[in-house]
């Protein structure tokens, strides 16, 4: 009996651990998204292919055209052509999980907005690592590159002789194509993204995480705080609303439905102070009640109503660089 109790305890602990993992405690490929991205977009390929009718390989004009072009390729062996054809007909053979969202992200930095340092890439979820290993091995053999694996993350350097250096990095959870135009150790940067925790990534932003959890054809995230440092302009930086913009993030979605495209957008703030600053800046805009709609012709396809508080509008413009002297003119007052 004494020997039986420890076994029961271990079984209970194992059951609890399995339950925790099954409830979402496992690794999330989205945790690789850089927190400094000013623009991030997700696309659900499975949903778009289903809605476009592209899932049926037997009657897909694009697939037929790609097959025809593949047949013209002279530098491919019969076996290579057959393999590529299988990928076209069933993209899941690549090892990527195309039932989940794929992501595109971009960051910018530097003092010159006309010549910024750009970083960005694509992030894919991995469904079958053995198939992805086979695909990468074929590419390496064909291109003369090789994968360097450390701590479970394999990295292949690409485009080293071009203006933008890049890498393909992957493990059993995610595959990332990452490029940058600036100098620095790009491999170390990418390995850092694979090692970061949720709180260090873009998913650490609650509003962003909630948006990306929604089942949409396309999700978009635009972080004003990540792009404002690029605007190295004294007039822009001195505008009253700049402090509020630093804590502002816009999230939105696009869904393709029969006969229409549905879009939604919302703005979130990192704290109540940033939200209060923005609300104070736009205090010159009067809320609309819809009372003016009675004067709009019934056949109109659209209408816009805008109300302004003249005194608050004057105060706002007076605080704007370049407008202060104009607003101080007695004739303007």
What are these regions (language model features)?
Residues 1-21:
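Sec-dependent bacterial lipoprotein signal peptides
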Residues 23-155, 202-247, 261-333:
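Structural boundary/hinge residues at secondary-structure and domain interfaces
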Residues 31, 165-189, 255-282:
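Charged, amphipathic alpha-helical scaffolding segments
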């Amino acid at each position: 009996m004494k020997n039986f109790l420890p076994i029961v305890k271990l079984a209970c602990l194992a059951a609890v651990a399995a339950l925790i993992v099954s409830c979402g405690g496992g690794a999330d490929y989205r945790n690789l998204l850089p927190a400094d991205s000013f623009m991030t977009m997700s696309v659900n390929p499975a949903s778009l292919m289903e809605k476009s009718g592209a899932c049926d390989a037997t009657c897909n004009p694009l697939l037929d055209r790609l097959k025809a072009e593949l047949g013209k390729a002279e530098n491919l062996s019969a076996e290579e052509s057959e393999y590529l054809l299988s990928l076209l007909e069933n993209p899941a053979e690549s090892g990527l999980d195309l039932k989940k969202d794929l992501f595109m992200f971009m960051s910018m930095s530097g003092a010159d907005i006309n010549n910024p340092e750009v970083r960005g890439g694509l992030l894919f979820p991995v469904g079958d690592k053995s198939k992805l290993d086979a695909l990468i091995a074929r590419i390496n053999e064909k291109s003369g590159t090789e994968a360097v694996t450390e701590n479970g993350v394999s990295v292949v350097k690409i485009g080293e002789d071009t203006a933008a250096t890049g890498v393909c990095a992957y493990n059993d959870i995610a595959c990332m194509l990452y490029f940058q135009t600036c100098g620095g150790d790009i491999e170390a940067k990418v390995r850092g993204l694979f090692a970061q925790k949720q709180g260090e990534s873009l998913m650490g932003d609650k509003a962003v995480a909630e948006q990306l959890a929604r089942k949409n054809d396309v999700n978009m995230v635009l972080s004003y705080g990540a792009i404002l440092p690029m605007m190295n302009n004294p007039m822009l930086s001195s505008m009253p609303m700049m402090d509020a913009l630093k804590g502002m993030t816009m999230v939105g979605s696009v869904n393709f439905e029969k006969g229409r495209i549905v879009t939604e957008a919302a703005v979130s703030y990192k704290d109540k102070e940033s939200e209060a600053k923005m609300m104070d800046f736009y205090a010159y805009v009067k809320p609309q009640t819809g009372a003016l709609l009675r004067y709009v012709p019934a056949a109109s396809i659209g209408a816009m109503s805008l109300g302004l508080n003249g005194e608050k509008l004057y105060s706002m413009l007076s605080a704007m660089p370049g407008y202060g002297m104009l607003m101080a003119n007695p004739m303007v007052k």
